[in-house]
Amino acid sequence: MSSTAKHGIELLHDPSLNKSTAFTEAEKQALGLVGLVPDVTETEELQLQRVNLQLAQKPTDLERYIYLINLLDHDETLFYRTVMSDPVRFLPIVYDPTIGEACLKFGHIYRQPRGMYLSITRRGRVKDVLKNWPQKDVRFICVTDGGRILGLGDLGANGAGIPIGKLQLYTACAGVPPQFLLPMYLDAGTNNEQYLHDPLYLGMRKTRPTTEELYSFVDEFVQAVQEVFPKCCIHFEDWTGKDAVHLLQRYRDKYCVYNDDVQGTAGITLAGMINAAKVKGTKLKDEKYLFLGAGSAGIGLANLLCSALVAQGMTLKEA
């Protein structure tokens, strides 16, 4: 039986506790739910059957994304049950590539708040803002400033969908409990004129500040996280290449920080290169490499590849 201080409608409005038609008769009696939900007890399999039926009626992946996010806002358990019932089918809907279209239209498809939104205008009060988050034991924050979302460029506040989606993968793929996760958007403005003139844009209607102002804002944020959530790892996601590399170097020796674009993509790609070389019967140092552009992922891979080449006997200059 569920153990919670919440009862009745309050419980049904909490997506982390709501099970809708899956509450047992004993739970309905104990939690004040009799008459508030249909008088049946469904299995998760039957609930999933209904979800799939409703998804089949959606004509596009964007509409399926909107449906699934709405499900997440009402019943977290059923959302993750759905995603993990068929990861190959659902991960491209809740994250890349569909998340790209969702971010482009974020202000237009927005339903209700998820995560936190922290504006640069709150400088000097960042710690107080973080204390507004209801969960006090946050283990991972995924944070973006919307500076370079996927391959779409500066999306500003529309990029808030990225940390939301990325942390869904933490739970769906790694089993991290959702209550330990906090999606975060740092609003330092945008240079995207289209969004600055869009009445439904949800971010600050100012162009981006100087680099020094941005880094000062991020400094306060990172320090505030150490004080409010001392067990937390900060995951930087989809910053510009310059900012991604700089912020990682700025904090990595002092705090628990990680950049998926610089480190995660690089690690996975290098692993693929190493195994491809094994299949060919060659070594990394025997190959030539072409990088298209110099984004954060490319820079991260180039640095890691150089380290791997040095490990195979080359000098850093040769690498």
Predicted features along the sequence, with ranges:
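N-terminal ligand-binding/catalytic initiation module
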Residues: 1-256
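Glycine-rich phosphate/diphosphate-binding loop of Rossmann-like nucleotide-binding domains
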Residues: 254, 259-319
